[in-house]
Structure formats: C-alpha cells, structure tokens
Amino acid sequence: MILNAKFLISASKIDEAPQPIYTEIAFLGRSNVGKSSLINTLCKNKNLAKSSSTPGKTQLINFFEVDCKKDEDKFKLIFIDLPGFGYAKVSKKTKAIWNKNLDEFLKERSSIKLFIHLIDSRHENLDIDLNLDLYLDSFIRADQKKITVFTKADKLNQSQKAKLLNANKNAILVSNLKKSGIDKLEQKIILESLGFNEE
C-alpha cells in the first residue's frame, strides 16, 4: 500500500532530472485526462500534484517520492507526472522542443519500469491515444511494463463500463471522484514494481 508521498523536483529535460535511485513509475496521457488528480488520489494527498482544468498546464516533468509497504517490507518508488500530450497553449517551436525533451526522457530514463497510460473512458479510441500506445510499444524494453488506465469512470453507466473492460481485458477503470478502482491500481503498481506478475 502507499503510505505517503512528497514532491521532489521539476525538470524540463532528462539532464535536469534527479539521479535515479528507486524504481520509477511514469504517468502519461493526453492533456486533461487526470494524471495529476490520479497521483493525488493514489497518494491520499489532494495537494501533492498540481492539477488544473486548463489543458496543457503541466509543462514540466514532476517527480514525487512515494513511501510504500507490502506485508512488513517498506520501500520507496518515484512517481513521474508527465506533461500532457497533444495540447498546449505554446508556440510551435516551444512545443517541438518540449516533445523532443519528452521523447528523450522516456526512451533514455532506464529507471522507469512501469508506464501508466491514462485514457478518458468516454473517448477510448482517439488517434492521440492509439498513437501514444504505438509509440510506447516502439521502445518499451523487456524489463518495462505498461498499464492502461481508463479515467473518469463515474461518467459511464454500468453497461458502458462492462463493454469497455470487455474490449480491454487488462485495463483498469478508475474514478478519482468516486475513488473506484484506486485500490486495484495501487495494488497493481506495488506488485509490478516489486517484480511480481499477477497473471
């Protein structure tokens, strides 16, 4: 389980990132999908990661040190809140630099062991998410894994939820508002981080 967490540092590129010490978990998805809010819910601290209703607000790579426990063992993880893909009120030049820095960070940061791809459950097949999935698959290593998480589950009815999960067998459906699916995701993160595999 996650005990608590604290903000470490913000970085705009890999050179500014802290030296990797612990296993890292990267949260990524399109803008305004709820990455910061999910990190806050998982860490039981609504003020930890700064979330905003304005798409593209998170323009830096933010690192959080997370204290965890499984049985009697305590350990630390690093959660990484990444800038949202696909939307930002910035110039084309700034966006190009930003995308280059993100690409370099994701491909070269070998301490990232788990990618959590967040998708708005109401819009499951957008090109940006399909492309992000293909992008991750293009470089993900044998010692890395990917979890698909559908957010904003409270916006769906029961039949919509069932249909979504039926089409995406290994995905997890969460709602920050209702706190549903959070425990399941938390357990999955802990197990994967420790090298366990539930399947």
Swiss-Prot record:
Cofactors that this protein relies on: Mg(2+)
GO molecular function: GTP binding; metal ion binding
Gene3D superfamilies (UniProt xref): P-loop containing nucleotide triphosphate hydrolases
BP terms from Gene Ontology: division septum assembly
CDD domains, sorted: YihA_EngB
Residues reported to bind Mg(2+): 36, 58
Limits of the EngB-type G domain: 21-195
Keywords of this entry: Cell cycle, Cell division, GTP-binding, Magnesium, Metal-binding, Nucleotide-binding, Septation
GO cellular component: cytosol
Binding site for GTP: 29-36, 56-60, 81-84, 151-154, 174-176
Protein family (similarity comment): Belongs to the TRAFAC class TrmE-Era-EngA-EngB-Septin-like GTPase superfamily. EngB GTPase family.
NCBIfam families the record matches: GTPase_YsxC
Described function: Necessary for normal cell division and for the maintenance of normal septation.
Protein name (Swiss-Prot/TrEMBL): Probable GTP-binding protein EngB
Species the sequence originates in: Campylobacter lari (strain RM2100 / D67 / ATCC BAA-1060)
